[in-house]
């Protein structure tokens, strides 16, 4: 009937066998602790099993249960410690101590108080185990007498346990998502989740209390199976294993909890580090000939350990003798360097180099530091008590601790060098910045001098600018507009557009502004057969070509002095072509001797006579100038046109594109018999009542572009007049 209401688990059976009234079974206790640490059983279930076992009335069973509980506390992991430090277990112990019924056995009571004190001392500073300290102080206040305190480190309760499993939707190694075909698998060593491809290895984990092979991922498998390689100079001395170290150790870790190969490597590394620590005064030189010759003497297997000890002693003695010889040679080298300066002495000194700095680490010291780091790294996977059972690690730690002053001096020297280099770098950057500034100033000054040297360059520019600018200086005292348009006469000029400003001139009485046809002249007016293309094209490339007369033409009113004018300025050279022999306007500075000083209203009349007499009707002139009559000399018509246009440009004072008066040469009068290709251009003249300057502004559109809209009404169209030259023929 009792079996119906109570069931015994496998853990309860093992606990009963481990806590029987017979002698203590330490192996079974460790096996139970491994089960708890590997999480094969739940920690709460294990705690309740031990609590039930403590209720037994047999004092031997209670003492055995307390010992088993202490073993599980020290080796069961933090998850089991949390259950022991819970109120459920600790209050049960307090109730056993304070029971008023049957008195508790004295040995059981002392053992219980001792364990509570030890657990409270080891759990100091851990918030998850603070109830142990509270129970200990509560019992002290109630008057319980505890045994003398033992200094117990908190590492006594530290033991490696399998980590908590982590969940994820993808493999934490190859990032492959899990699906119905790709299942999740947890690594027992790290707790991460992987797929089947990344966790196909199995390995026992004795450091976690897992003795049977379990699933691990590829990374943990490589980390656990690969052993840190020893230095190359240690492999030659692998035969000199001191087995006396194993005999001297009273507490040997059990084979189920540590790998045999790890123990051998650890002892070998410790022995070699001790040998090197004894000979740390030397520069790292260890003779290898004696070591390589000694193993041949070990012949029999019976006295193998004794012979290895003798060989080890002989090797140490040989290394000490070599060290003394090396010291003597080093001292002799120092004396020889101080006394002699010849080449032979220098060669012998070079054979035994002196240490560069006293604070530099020797190769042996560097090797000891790396060895100690490797050993500490490997001890992390071992039970907590392993480091306490290996006194050689402590000796190696002390020998390395003696290097701290040397390392501090080296660090200080390095920091001073670093500060010096930073200072030098700052100075160098400042000097480079100053040098760059000097170079920039020198380049800027050279560029400004170069630009001033080429301010006025004669000749036409191959890249004309569409928008002209007024030059800064005017040669020969001419006004800005006259210098702009006549500083370098253009070979082919179009008739000016009639948007002349009506400002009066300062030295002449201008009664009527110059009127001219608006927009560029149609190509039909100058489309004479047999004309030659000028050598330099116009600045806009669209002006009609006009044949140039020969220099010996009798109709030239002014002398041909193309080189008599000064060179154009830098701005005018973009808008003026090569000088024309017939259009040197700068050579004209006033009325010619023998000519009548007429007002400027005659120039538009002559232009009308030259261009529009083919209509058969005279062009109407302004009523304010009835006294002007056309000249009798037909050859002087272009000159008067130029003269009129030049003073019109002077009256405006501003350059415009359409104000470049292009007077046709005298030869053009004999080829105007062709009919115009377009409608006759209207005459742009102001009405008598209009004031001067009523035009909106100069037309700056390029020659050849469509004529802009004008704000004045053109005169009535006249019939094409016949050229006077044709009448003369």
From Swiss-Prot:
GO BP terms in the entry: protein targeting to vacuole; protein transport to vacuole involved in ubiquitin-dependent protein catabolic process via the multivesicular body sorting pathway
Domain UIM: 261-280, 307-326
Keyword annotations of the record: Endosome, Membrane, Metal-binding, Repeat, Zinc, Zinc-finger
GO CC, one annotated term: ESCRT-0 complex
Polar residues biased stretches: 279-290, 520-534, 560-575, 626-649
Positions annotated as zinc finger (FYVE-type): 165-225
GO molecular function: phosphatidylinositol-3-phosphate binding; ubiquitin binding; zinc ion binding
Sequence segments annotated as region (Disordered): 276-310, 325-356, 496-729
Compartments, record wording: Endosome membrane
Top-level taxon of the source organism: Eukaryota
Domain notes per entry: The FYVE domain is involved in the binding to phosphatidylinositol 3-phosphate (PtdIns(3)P) which is required for the association to endosomal membranes.
Family as reported in the entry's similarity comment: Belongs to the VPS27 family.
Cited function: Component of the ESCRT-0 complex which is the sorting receptor for ubiquitinated cargo proteins at the multivesicular body (MVB) and recruits ESCRT-I to the MVB outer membrane.
Database matches in PANTHER family: VACUOLAR PROTEIN SORTING-ASSOCIATED PROTEIN 27 (PTHR47794:SF1)
Self-association and partners: Component of the ESCRT-0 complex composed of HSE1 and VPS27.
UniProt-recorded name of the protein: Vacuolar protein sorting-associated protein 27
Organism whose genome encodes this protein: Aspergillus fumigatus (strain ATCC MYA-4609 / CBS 101355 / FGSC A1100 / Af293)
Taxonomic classification: Eukaryota, Fungi, Dikarya, Ascomycota, Pezizomycotina
Encoding gene (name): vps27
């Amino acid at each position: 009937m009792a079996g119906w209401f109570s069931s015994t688990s496998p853990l309860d059976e093992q606990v009963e066998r481990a806590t029987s009234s017979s002698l203590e079974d330490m192996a079974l206790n460790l096996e139970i602790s491994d089960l708890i640490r590997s999480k094969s059983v739940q920690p709460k279930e294990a705690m309740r099993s031990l609590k039930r076992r403590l209720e037994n009335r047999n004092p031997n069973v209670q003492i055995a249960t307390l010992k088993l509980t202490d073993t599980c506390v020290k080796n069961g992991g933090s998850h089991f410690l949390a259950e022991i430090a819970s109120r459920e277990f600790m209050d049960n112990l307090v109730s056993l101590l304070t029971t008023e019924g049957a008195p508790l056995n004295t040995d059981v009571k002392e053992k219980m108080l001792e364990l509570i004190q030890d657990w409270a001392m080891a759990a100091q500073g851990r918030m998850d185990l603070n109830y142990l300290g509270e129970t200990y102080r509560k019992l002290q206040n109630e008057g319980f007498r505890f045994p003398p305190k033992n200094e117990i480190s908190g590492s006594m309760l530290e033991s490696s346990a399998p980590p908590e499993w982590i969940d994820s939707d993808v493999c934490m190694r190859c990032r492959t998502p899990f699906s119905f075909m790709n299942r999740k698998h947890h690594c027992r060593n790290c707790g991460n989740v992987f797929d089947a491809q990344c966790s196909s290895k199995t390995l026992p984990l004795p450091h976690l209390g897992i003795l049977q092979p379990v699933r691990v991922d590829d990374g943990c498998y490589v980390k656990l199976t690969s052993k840190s390689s020893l230095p190359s100079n240690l492999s030659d001395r692998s035969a000199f294993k001191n087995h006396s170290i194993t005999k001297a150790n009273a507490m040997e870790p059990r084979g189920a909890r540590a790998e045999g190969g790890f123990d051998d490597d650890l002892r070998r590394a410790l022995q070699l580090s001790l040998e090197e620590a004894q000979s740390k005064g030397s520069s790292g030189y260890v003779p290898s000939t004696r070591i390589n010759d000694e193993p041949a003497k070990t012949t029999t297997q019976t006295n193998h350990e004794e012979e290895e000890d003798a060989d080890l002693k002989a090797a140490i003695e040989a290394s000490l003798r070599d060290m003394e010889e090396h010291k003597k040679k080093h001292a002799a080298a120092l004396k020889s360097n101080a006394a002699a300066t010849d080449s032979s002495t220098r060669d012998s000194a070079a054979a035994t180099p002196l240490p560069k700095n006293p604070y530099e680490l020797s190769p042996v010291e560097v090797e000891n530091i790396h060895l100690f780091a490797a050993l500490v790294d490997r001890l992390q996977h071992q039970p907590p008590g392993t480091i306490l059972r290996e006194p050689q690690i402590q000796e190696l730690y002390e020998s390395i601790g003696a290097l701290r002053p040397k390392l501090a001096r080296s660090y200080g020297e390095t920091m001073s060098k670093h500060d010096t280099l930073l200072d030098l770098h700052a100075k160098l950057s400042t000097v480079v910045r100053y040098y760059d500034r000097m170079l920039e100033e020198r380049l800027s000054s050279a560029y400004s001098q170069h630009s001033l040297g080429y301010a006025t360059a004669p000749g036409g520019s191959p890249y004309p600018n569409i928008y002209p600018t007024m030059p800064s200086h005017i040669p020969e005292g001419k006004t800005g507009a006259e210098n702009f348009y006549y500083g370098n006469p253009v070979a082919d000029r179009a008739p000016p557009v009639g948007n002349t400003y009506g400002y009066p001139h300062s030295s002449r009485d201008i009664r009527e502004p110059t009127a001219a046809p608006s927009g560029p002249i149609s190509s039909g007016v100058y489309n004479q057969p047999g004309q030659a293309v000028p050598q330099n094209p116009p600045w806009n490339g669209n002006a009609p070509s006009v044949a140039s007369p020969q220099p010996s033409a009798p109709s030239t009113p002014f002398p041909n002095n193309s080189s008599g004018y000064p060179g154009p300025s830098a701005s005018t050279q973009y808008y003026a072509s090569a000088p024309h022999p017939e259009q040197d306007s700068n050579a004209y500075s006033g009325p010619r001797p023998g000519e009548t000083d007429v007002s400027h209203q005659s120039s538009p009349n002559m232009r009308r006579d030259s261009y529009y007499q083919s209509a058969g009707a005279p062009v109407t002139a302004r009523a304010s100038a009835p006294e002007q009559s056309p000249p009798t000399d037909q050859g002087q018509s272009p000159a008067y046109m130029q003269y009129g246009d030049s003073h019109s440009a002077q009256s405006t004072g501003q350059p415009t594109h359409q104000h470049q008066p292009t007077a046709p040469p005298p030869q053009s009068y004999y080829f105007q018999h062709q009919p115009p290709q377009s409608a006759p251009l209207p005459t742009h003249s102001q009405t008598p009542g209009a004031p001067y300057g009523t035009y909106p502004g100069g037309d700056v559109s390029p020659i050849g572009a469509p004529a802009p809209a004008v704000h004045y009404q053109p005169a009535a169209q006249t019939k094409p007049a016949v050229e006077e030259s044709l009448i003369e023929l």
